[in-house]
């Protein structure tokens, strides 16, 4: 099951998350984590060109860190010709340096991929995601989960 949403339809965060795009991260650098999450999306059949998407993520990070604070990063890349958005989630047990705006290490990485021609839909997705992650209890729950199924329960109904 893939976690995609057609950018012409409404979405919920729970509709964008699926078990095949959630992982417990083992990498200890931002670049390696971006690669790991890109690979996850490619294996789920969401990327025709994983390498190009990965390079786009690195280019975006070089402009400005996507570490939004609160232990969260939301890297994102645009995919030419894509009709769908997807969200991949990586959870890191210890946290890594990400040059986040609050200086804290990052433990939750939400990778967004989607069409380059749907900026308003992307902003709605980003807004919904950041609003959801402002909930300290939800972030705390995500940091305590042990299984992908537990992650899915945290986002049920969101």
Residue ranges and their predicted role:
Residues 1-158:
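Cytosolic covalent-transfer regions centered on His/Cys nucleophiles
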């Amino acid at each position: 099951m893939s976690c995609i949403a057609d950018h012409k339809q409404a979405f919920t965060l729970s509709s964008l998350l699926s078990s095949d795009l959630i992982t417990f991260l083992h990498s200890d650098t931002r670049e390696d984590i971006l690669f790991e999450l890109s690979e996850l999306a490619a294996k789920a059949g969401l990327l025709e060109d994983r390498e190009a998407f990965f390079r786009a993520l690195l280019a975006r990070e070089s402009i400005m860190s996507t570490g939004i604070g609160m232990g969260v990063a939301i890297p994102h890349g645009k995919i030419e010709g894509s009709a769908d958005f997807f969200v991949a989630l990586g959870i890191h047990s210890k946290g890594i340096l990400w040059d986040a705006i609050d200086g804290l290490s990052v433990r939750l990485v939400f990778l967004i991929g989607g069409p380059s021609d749907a900026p308003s839909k992307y902003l709605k997705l980003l807004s919904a995601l950041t609003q959801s992650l402002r909930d300290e209890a939800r972030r705390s729950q995500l940091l305590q989960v042990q299984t992908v199924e537990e992650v899915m329960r945290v986002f049920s109904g969101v």
